[in-house]
Amino acid sequence: VVEAGTGVGKTFSYLVPALLSGERVLLSTATKALQDQLFARDLPRLAQTLGLPVRMALLKGRASYLCLYRMELARQDVSAREPGVARVLAKVESWSHGTRSGDLAELTGLDERSPVIPLVTSTRENCLGSQCPRFRECHVHLARREALAADIVVINHHLFFADVAVRESGMAELLPSVRVVVFDEAHQINETGVQFLGLTLSTGQLMDFGRDLLAAGLQHARGLADWTGLASQVDLSARDLRLAAGMTWLLV
């Protein structure tokens, strides 16, 4: 772990070894702004200076890419008939004819909170995969193919941990397998990792567990334990935890 102030050259200090290593490397950032800067400016400049024919790829989550099929569906969407939405949708359609990557960050003036974005991007749930009529032109699919063939892949922390979660489920892999991963803006890793890999348990869930414990115990194992007492202990502990957490919040 290396920490240093702004402007001392942290970025170049890890990019140069990454380029010279000969290894396939993932470079992960916390923000898409730095991700774009590394791919569009810093990496090409260093690769040219060092005279290295390095294949580089930029890969973001699917919500960053235009889905051509969903854009077609959006034309028929009722909400797209609203003047403001229709105007932005027309702008997206016009841009779609010239973009190679389909990265919505290329589209100047598109607010990341725009209601059009969910209409023209896909999710894991609504993506048709290889069954999609526009699959051969799919920007997400093409971006992942380029990443698999690249020596240096620039990603973000959200995508890295999404890949870890998907791999653990045994469903698929989002990123190429590598031996070297460099995390820039690493102070945000914990928060992002918890979002994808953490589990939450509320005091309300603990109280529900106590009630379920009592019901199951009385139904299936009556007389083998003091189920009422055990359930009461769980409920009391949950209430004590809630009170302690509330007091901690007040102290902070």
Region locations from a protein language model:
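Walker A/P-loop
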Residues: 1-14
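Proline-rich low-complexity regions
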Residues: 17, 66-67, 176
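Alpha-helix C-terminal capping segments
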Residues: 16-22
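An acidic- and aromatic-residue-enriched active-site/binding cleft used to recognize and process polar
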Residues: 5-7, 18, 30-32, 61-62, ...
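Signature of the SF2 helicase/ATPase Hel1-core->accessory helical subdomain module
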Residues: 20, 36, 41-44, 124-126, ...
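Short coil/turn segments at secondary-structure boundaries
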Residues: 2-5, 104-111, 221-229, 249-250
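A substrate-engagement module of RecA-like helicase motors
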Residues: 23-153, 157-158, 218
